[in-house]
């Protein structure tokens, strides 16, 4: 097999070395010419895999190490008989960790009690569903809007987007980017909906940039709107709007899901799909390539404050403010310089682990055990 992989996909050799020759390119450089002699294509969300790129090529399998598939022309895949796989849920936990870090930062700036907020989660799939589980596990009030899932689960606890926007203090977006169809999500938060947000609302977008009208949001913030905003995704990536970023509390270069576990899990999942397509046995597993957790164990004093414990456990693993600082330093120079810096921050992103790898002792205190279990860490 002739395999072409995005150069930023990790451990490709570990999984695919015995399957043929492997060539690597920057994801944005993968085009029609690059696919002339390729059987298997492995990509991330930065590569548009379209009819124009694939027509006449020998590509027969496409794997994307991402949850979303809006960069894949699935209609053409079906027409051309091209097998494909995404990696659903691969980085979901990393995104949840990111959102928790943003909430902690917002609470610190606002002097707010996280337990007193009402959370609105828009999109309850792989990422949003896990976030809902964590927030409810902590005992917090959560409203969920997911029309496609509501249609499948009519007895589920769902609310309309209008009700969620009217009642939630915190809004976290986790929808795919659908430009048409029954439930389009492009500019789901458009200018009228953004303008109608309650004063003091916190908004987090770690889904796709165009789910929020970036220009409308910038105008709103420039006008002094009382909002706290965390954006990991941007319209026109890798060109992020520096004026919008300057008005966000947290601004990062599409790295919410960039945990080490998430990256390796994504490669493992497309390898599993590839083996199923080929009808061959899997020779490598995620556990073969995943290093030991970096924190062997944490001991909480049974008398500590549960809110402090929550913040400490989350920040022991990840604090998005470090990524925010690095991103802001990159938002200088001309547009070409900023685009290159955006991609460089993603390419050279430092390893980060997930909260689920923590092993935590609580001395038997029930309130602390609840925090540990809600976060998905291991209780010892």
UniProtKB/Swiss-Prot annotation:
Cell compartments where the protein resides: Cytoplasm
Active site (record annotation): 208, 237, 254 (proton donor)
GO biological process, any: pyridoxine biosynthetic process
EC number: 1.1.1.290
Primary residence: cytoplasm
Xref: InterPro entries: D-isomer_2_OHA_DH_cat_dom (IPR006139), D-isomer_DH_CS (IPR029753), D-isomer_DH_NAD-bd (IPR006140), Erythronate-4-P_DHase (IPR020921), Erythronate-4-P_DHase_dimer (IPR024531), NAD(P)-bd_dom_sf (IPR036291), PdxB_dimer_sf (IPR038251)
PANTHER family recorded: FORMATE DEHYDROGENASE 1 (PTHR42938:SF9)
Family named by the database record: Belongs to the D-isomer specific 2-hydroxyacid dehydrogenase family. PdxB subfamily.
Protein name: Erythronate-4-phosphate dehydrogenase
Natural source organism: Pseudomonas aeruginosa (strain LESB58)
Origin organism lineage: Bacteria, Pseudomonadati, Pseudomonadota, Gammaproteobacteria, Pseudomonadales
Gene it is expressed from: pdxB
């Amino acid at each position: 097999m002739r395999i072409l992989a995005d150069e930023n996909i990790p451990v490709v050799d570990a999984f695919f070395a015995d399957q043929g020759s492997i060539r690597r390119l920057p994801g944005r450089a993968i085009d029609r010419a690059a696919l002339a002699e390729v059987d298997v294509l492995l990509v991330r969300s930065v590569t548009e895999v379209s009819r124009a790129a694939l027509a006449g090529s020998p590509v027969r399998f496409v794997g994307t190490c991402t949850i979303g598939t809006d960069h894949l022309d699935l209609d053409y895949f079906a027409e051309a008989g091209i097998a494909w796989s995404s990696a659903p849920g691969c980085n979901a936990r990393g995104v949840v960790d990111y959102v928790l870090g943003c909430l902690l930062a917002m609470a610190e700036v606002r002097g707010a009690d996280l337990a007193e907020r009402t959370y609105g989660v828009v999109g309850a799939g792989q990422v949003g569903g896990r976030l809902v589980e964590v927030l409810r596990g902590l005992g917090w009030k959560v409203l969920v809007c997911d029309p496609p899932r509501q249609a499948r689960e009519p007895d589920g606890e769902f609310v309309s987007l209008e009700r969620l926007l009217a009642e939630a203090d915190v809004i976290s977006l986790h929808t795919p980017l659908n430009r048409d169809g029954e439930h389009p999500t492009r500019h789901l938060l458009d200018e009228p909906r953004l303008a109608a947000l309650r004063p003091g609302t916190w908004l987090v977008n770690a889904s796709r940039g165009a789910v929020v009208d970036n220009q409308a949001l910038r105008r709103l913030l420039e006008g002094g709107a009382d909002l706290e905003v965390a954006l990991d995704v941007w319209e026109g990536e890798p060109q992020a709007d520096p004026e919008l970023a300057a008005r966000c509390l947290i601004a990062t270069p599409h790295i919410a899901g960039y945990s080490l576990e998430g990256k390796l899990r994504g490669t493992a999942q497309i390898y599993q799909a590839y083996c199923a397509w080929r009808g061959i046995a899997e020779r490598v597993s995620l556990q073969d390539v995943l290093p030991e957790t970096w924190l062997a164990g944490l001991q909480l004093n049974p008398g500590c404050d549960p809110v402090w414990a929550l913040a400490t456990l989350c920040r022991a693993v990840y604090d998005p403010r470090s990524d925010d600082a690095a991103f802001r330093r990159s938002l200088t120079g001309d547009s070409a310089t900023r685009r290159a810096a955006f991609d460089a921050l993603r390419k050279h992103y430092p390893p980060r682990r997930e909260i689920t790898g923590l092993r935590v002792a609580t001395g038997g205190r029930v309130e602390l055990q609840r925090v540990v279990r809600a976060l998905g860490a291991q209780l010892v």
